Amino acid sequence: MLAKRIVPCLDVKEGKVVKGVQFRNHEIVGDIVPLAARYADEGADELVFYDITASAHDRVIDKSWVSRVAERIDIPFCVAGGIRTIEQAREKLAFGADKISINSPALTDPSLIERLQEEFGRQCIVIGIDSYYDHISDSYKVKQFTGDEAATKDTQWYTQDWVEEVQKRGCGEIVLNVMNQDGVRQGYDIEQLSMIRSLCDVPLIASGGAGTMAHFKDVFALAKVDAALAASVFHKGIIDIQALKRYLRDNQIAVRV
């Protein structure tokens, strides 16, 4: 059995790590490299960095901190934010990132997924999906440019359809960001994640809602995801990564300790 992965997420804005609730009202929580080093030292399996306003503001990730992170940590990490071209992706990988993730640019130009996987291989192409449960229509819908409240907009895609589309185009992994659960620490959306898991032939990473160790256990045991991403519980010291891994191991969840 493949070990489940614990993935701290670092949202980056103007050179600092920030965290919001349901993608709004972001507050500064720390500096990029020290936080990355802390999580690597605590036993994280990999890290994800999102430059949350890069796509909305039509710019790309600052390569300087990417190289500094690569120099300091010895675990895989993924970067996302404003990557629209092969050249931009190549630069981030050259500066030390192991994977690149695209979200809003893929919605604007789905063929970008195919071009990236043809150039670099699908193993390092991650698709982030910001999924919002719409109570009126009782459906899951994909939103775009979510890093900036003023720029956030609806798309024509239902989450299930977009999950199938990005796989057809060659993504190697999917991060499902459940917007309704983000930052509220009430647990992962097991129902939605289970539904998406049934459509996924690639690794699925759950994002949004972690508040307790039991939430991690449930998302692995019930939704069968491959990895669980979380931010605020790690940033605020609510959950220690090594303690979490011991808890998961004691509950028959395979993890690297």
From Swiss-Prot:
Main localization, broad class: cytoplasm
GO cellular component: cytoplasm
Record keywords: Amino-acid biosynthesis, Cytoplasm, Histidine biosynthesis, Lyase
Pfam families found in the cross-reference section: His_biosynth
Record EC number: 4.3.2.10
GO BP, one annotated term: L-histidine biosynthetic process
Top-level EC class: lyase
Pathway where it operates: Amino-acid biosynthesis; L-histidine biosynthesis; L-histidine from 5-phospho-alpha-D-ribose 1-diphosphate: step 5/9
SUPFAM superfamilies the UniProt entry points to: Ribulose-phoshate binding barrel
Active-site positions on this chain: 11, 130
Localization per Swiss-Prot or TrEMBL: Cytoplasm
Family matches, as InterPro entries: Aldolase_TIM, His_biosynth, HisF, IGPS_HisA/HisF, RibuloseP-bd_barrel
MF terms in GO: imidazoleglycerol-phosphate synthase activity; lyase activity
Catalytic activity: 5-[(5-phospho-1-deoxy-D-ribulos-1-ylimino)methylamino]-1-(5-phospho-beta-D-ribosyl)imidazole-4-carboxamide + L-glutamine = D-erythro-1-(imidazol-4-yl)glycerol 3-phosphate + 5-amino-1-(5-phospho-beta-D-ribosyl)imidazole-4-carboxamide + L-glutamate + H(+)
Function statement: IGPS catalyzes the conversion of PRFAR and glutamine to IGP, AICAR and glutamate. The HisF subunit catalyzes the cyclization activity that produces IGP and AICAR from PRFAR using the ammonia provided by the HisH subunit.
Family: Belongs to the HisA/HisF family.
PANTHER family referenced in this protein's UniProt entry, alphabetically: IMIDAZOLE GLYCEROL PHOSPHATE SYNTHASE HISHF (PTHR21235:SF2), IMIDAZOLE GLYCEROL PHOSPHATE SYNTHASE SUBUNIT HISF/H IGP SYNTHASE SUBUNIT HISF/H (PTHR21235)
Protein name in UniProt: Imidazole glycerol phosphate synthase subunit HisF
Organism in which the protein naturally occurs: Shewanella piezotolerans (strain WP3 / JCM 13877)
Gene symbol of the encoding locus: hisF
